[in-house]
Every structure is written in C-alpha cells, then in structure tokens.
C-alpha cells in the first residue's frame, strides 16, 4: 500500500492528467483511477464468466456480426475450431 506522501504525489500527478494506475485512464484523481481500474477489471472478468472462456475468446476473434447476415450464415462462414 502506498504511504500518505506517495498517495499525495500520485494524486497530484493524476490531477495533471497523468495515468498513475494501470487501467485507470480518465480518472481525475489517484482514488478515482483506482476505482476505474478495479471496475474495468471486474467488468471484464464478469463478462468472461457469463460467456465462458471459449465464448469470450470467440467473441474477441469474431468481433460483431454484420446486419446483412443471420447468425447461422455467420456461423457457416466462420472456420470451425473443433476437431
């Protein structure tokens, strides 16, 4: 855990627009950046749990579906990863 002095220095840097916490981009203070990073991490993990790791990986490879194709047509175009 950061000491009071370190927190104050990090807070000052964050107020100048610097990202001082990985994943805390956009936070206007050290504490705000911590909360943003925690929420982003938790949100990604929750999404992964909902889809399962296989679905999460497929979503990353595939991207969004196109409006001119149905899901079935998209699946037919997708190369099969099963053996």
Curated annotation (Swiss-Prot):
Compositional bias per record (Acidic residues), positions renumbered to this chain: 73-83
Region (Disordered): 1-83
Protein name: Late seed maturation protein P8B6
A family per Pfam: LEA_5
Main subcellular location: cytoplasm
PANTHER family documented for this protein: EM-LIKE PROTEIN GEA1 (PTHR34671), EM-LIKE PROTEIN GEA6 (PTHR34671:SF9)
Localization in the cell: Cytoplasm
Taxonomic lineage: Eukaryota, Viridiplantae, Streptophyta, Embryophyta, Tracheophyta
Organism superkingdom: Eukaryota
Organism: Raphanus sativus (Radish)
């Amino acid at each position: 855990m950061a000491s009071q002095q370190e927190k104050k220095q990090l807070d000052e840097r964050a107020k100048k627009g610097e990202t001082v916490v990985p994943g805390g981009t956009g936070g206007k203070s050290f504490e705000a950046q911590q909360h943003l990073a925690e929420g982003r991490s938790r949100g990604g993990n929750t999404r992964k749990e909902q889809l399962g790791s296989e679905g999460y990986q497929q979503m990353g490879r595939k991207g969004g579906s196109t409006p001119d194709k149905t899901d079935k047509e998209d699946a037919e175009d997708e190369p099969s990863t099963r053996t």
